[in-house]
Amino acid sequence: MVNLGLSRVDDAVAARHPGLEEFAACQSHAFMKGVFTFVTGTGATFGLLMFIKRKFPYPVQWSFLVSAIAGSVASYRVTSMECQKCSNLWLFLETGQLPKDISTDPHD
């Protein structure tokens, strides 16, 4: 039995897709990386804005708002890039080939 989050996948399905467990682990890692990016990005932005606030006073709710937006944007970027890597991994595990739009030539 392969676990995907809280649900279990049938053995027959797992046998047809041997890379399912690796893909699930990759997706989980990507989402946790996104959560970590949101927390650290929001905290770092808030700290920076509190430092700037000493020179240019403004209401603190703007610091919260800008920090949350910056953390969300950074988290979205990181999560989408990591999920794309997981999709490429899934295609490779299923077909044995890399997607056509990815070049493996280091000189490109």
From Swiss-Prot:
Q: Where in the cell is it found?
A: Membrane
**Where are the membrane-spanning stretches?**
30-52, 59-78
- The reply to whether Transmembrane figures as a keyword in the UniProt entry is yes
Q: Does the keyword Metal-binding apply?
A: no
Annotated InterPro entries: Tmem141, Tmem141_sf
Superkingdom to which the source organism belongs: Eukaryota
User: What Gene Ontology cellular-component terms does the record carry?
Assistant: membrane
**Which membrane topology describes this protein?**
Multi-pass membrane protein
**Which coarse location class describes where this protein primarily resides?**
membrane
Which keywords fit this entry according to its UniProt record?
Membrane, Transmembrane, Transmembrane helix
Q: Which family does the UniProt entry place this protein in?
A: Belongs to the TMEM141 family.
Q: What is this protein called?
A: Transmembrane protein 141
Q: Which organism is it from?
A: Mus musculus (Mouse)
**What are the top taxonomic ranks of the organism?**
Eukaryota, Metazoa, Chordata, Craniata, Vertebrata
Whichever gene encodes this chain, its name is Tmem141
